[in-house]
């Protein structure tokens, strides 16, 4: 399917249209939320200033008997409905701003900084499915 209607837009656009970037970001955040809850981590969503700097969220695990201090990971949240996999089929190839990549890979950062990419179906109608048997598939 080349074009699809998304409830927040009045017209159909190609699924790769930039208008869907906000929807993709919110879906990646929504996907990470129950994962953090399951492992007992706190998910802190950052405000626009940090988001513009490349940090969308911070995941923290509290101290426990094996870890005396909290474990903190900064996260850049992304999503794509047109993933590119390398020739070996092992790695996702994902374009990002050079400046953000340099910040993420800097040795001067205070904690690990991960890129979290949610791979969505190509068909927008399959991004979120709600039916009487399941809340969200």
Spell out what each predicted region is.
Residues 1-53, 59-137:
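Mixed-charge (Asp/Glu-Lys/Arg
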